[in-house]
Amino acid sequence: MEKIASFTIDHTKLKRGVYVSRQDKVAGNVITTFDLRLKEPNNEPALDGAASHTIEHIGATFLRNHKTWADRTIYFGPMGCQTGFYLILAGDWKAKDIVPLMQEMFAYVAQFTGTIPGESAVECGNFRFMDLIQAKEEAGKYFTEVLDNIAEKNLSYPS
């Protein structure tokens, strides 16, 4: 089998950031998959599963209700390695194009109060697996240390 595109990225050089992971054509339309890397692979502890699950619920709800991006949002969810999230948007986008959206979303998660969207047995298959406090900490850290004044090195995969 051929190696998938994400395995061709040198994860020993990968920093936290916002990256275009791939672009595909579906029925003649471009979709862009983004790598939202919250943790430096193999150098930082991975995201806590419950925190990641909470960010997924709040982030997906935010995106699907966003006045500009709702109709372009296809998917938002955690990476299996627990170092970040994938965001799939309809359209031909560059990483810098979505930085304002990511700043808005991660600030929203960091300041979130109230009931976590989908936090019930009826709405989620593992609704007790949530940690709002840690989710807010991780979102705030990503916003402050990466998204706010993001550098070019955090927008392009290492060569």
UniProtKB/Swiss-Prot annotation:
Enzyme Commission numbers on file: 4.4.1.21
GO MF term list: iron ion binding; S-ribosylhomocysteine lyase activity
InterPro entries per UniProt: LuxS_sf (IPR037005), Metalloenz_LuxS/M16 (IPR011249), S-ribosylhomocysteinase (IPR003815)
Binding site for Fe cation: H53, H57, C124
Top-level division of the source organism's lineage: Bacteria
Keywords per UniProt: Autoinducer synthesis, Iron, Lyase, Metal-binding, Quorum sensing
Gene3D superfamilies hit by this protein: S-ribosylhomocysteinase (LuxS) (3.30.1360.80)
Cofactor note: Binds 1 Fe cation per subunit.
Catalytic activity as recorded in UniProt: S-(5-deoxy-D-ribos-5-yl)-L-homocysteine = (S)-4,5-dihydroxypentane-2,3-dione + L-homocysteine
SUPFAM superfamilies reported in the protein's UniProt record: LuxS/MPP-like metallohydrolase (SSF63411)
GO BP terms, alphabetized: quorum sensing
Co-factor requirement: Fe cation
Nucleus listed as a keyword: no
Entry annotated with the keyword Iron: yes
Entry function: Involved in the synthesis of autoinducer 2 (AI-2) which is secreted by bacteria and is used to communicate both the cell density and the metabolic potential of the environment. The regulation of gene expression in response to changes in cell density is called quorum sensing. Catalyzes the transformation of S-ribosylhomocysteine (RHC) to homocysteine (HC) and 4,5-dihydroxy-2,3-pentadione (DPD).
Similarity comment: family membership: Belongs to the LuxS family.
Known partners and oligomeric status: Homodimer.
HAMAP family per record: LuxS
Protein name in UniProt: S-ribosylhomocysteine lyase
Provenance organism: Desulfotalea psychrophila (strain LSv54 / DSM 12343)
Gene label: luxS
